[in-house]
Amino acid sequence: MPDAGTPVGHGDVTQRVGVEVIRARGVDVEKLIKMLIANAAAEFASTYYYYTILRMHLAGYEDYKEICEDARLEDRAHWELIVPRIYELGGELPNDLPEFHNQAGCIAAKLPNPPTVVNILTVLLESERCAIRSWSAICVMTFGKDPRTYDMAARILNEEVEHEAWFIELLAHERDGKSIPSGHFRRGEPGEAPYSKNRRFYNP
């Protein structure tokens, strides 16, 4: 029987088979929980919140605002996807927002000074790159060992890679006058998150 060496006592609520199985396969569960909390903090506290401010300051660039809005809302969807997994693994979120913010795996995407469109796009781009590195690390850690966390991380990573491509395209055009196409598919609705919400793709 697969993973028969990870028994949990009948009616025991202090252990989780879903945790012991992946631990037996070599996952450092405590480290994984810390990484997921850091990524959750990055998606919510240092990205979703600050992207809201960045979007407001893309004045006069309605097309850029729309793309920023997709990234902003999809990062919120990522947050919603991560949190249940943290608790399933036996972890929990800090009961203090500043403490949670300080655990973020990426620096806060704060409004730059001066808040020019080029500076804002640069902040957005570097924020997405940090997210790609963070989720890639979790994919490597869980591949072949923890299919549930791996599937979640891979779905989020797919969208972060798209976000990076969007902001490369916009920044190259705005700052360098170059065309570096992202292959951007317009979302059917803002923040559709086709990977993390398992929705169909819409390509007009």
In which residue ranges do the predicted regions lie?
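Iron-associated oxidoreductase/ferritin-like identity signal
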Residues: M1-P204
